[in-house]
Amino acid sequence: AEVEDIYRPYKQKRRTRATIAREKGLAPLAKLLLSQTVTSGTLEALAAPYVNEEKGVMSTDDALAGAGDIIAETISDDAAIRAALRRLYRTRGVLWAKAATDEDSVYRLYYDYREPVSRVQGHRVLAVNRGEREGMLKAGVEIEDALALQEIRRAVFRGISISNAFVNACCEDAWRRLIE
């Protein structure tokens, strides 16, 4: 998994919103906002030089939206963040399962099942996996959004900047749209 995380930013991807934003020349704006080094002015003033109707960037809002997509993808591709979230899933995650159909089956014990990942027994994981494979269960591992966002913010934030609120929104977008 660690090797996959390291390789992930270089892996060939389908055309994402971030890819389109990079094609429009918004990567330098994203890098500037993510660096969190600008302490005066406004985001609109930073984005104004990137407005280019020929490339499809019609307004500062378009430029900021594209830069936000790039930042969110950068966050989601970061190997250290993915490793921290994986640790969080192992220590604070909850394995859940519920019935996928109305039929009664040998998996009825797992029709409304929740157990912390750190305490789950191996045979239960195998049973849930088997039930999911057979189409009798839906299952997954979840963690609290607040814990995941705290880990992401810990890795991303560098200090006080005019782009802090914007980068925070990008962290939430990365978590909800790309990682979770």
What are the language-model segments listed below?
Residues 1-180:
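Duplex nucleic acid-engaging cores and interfaces of nucleic-acid transaction enzymes
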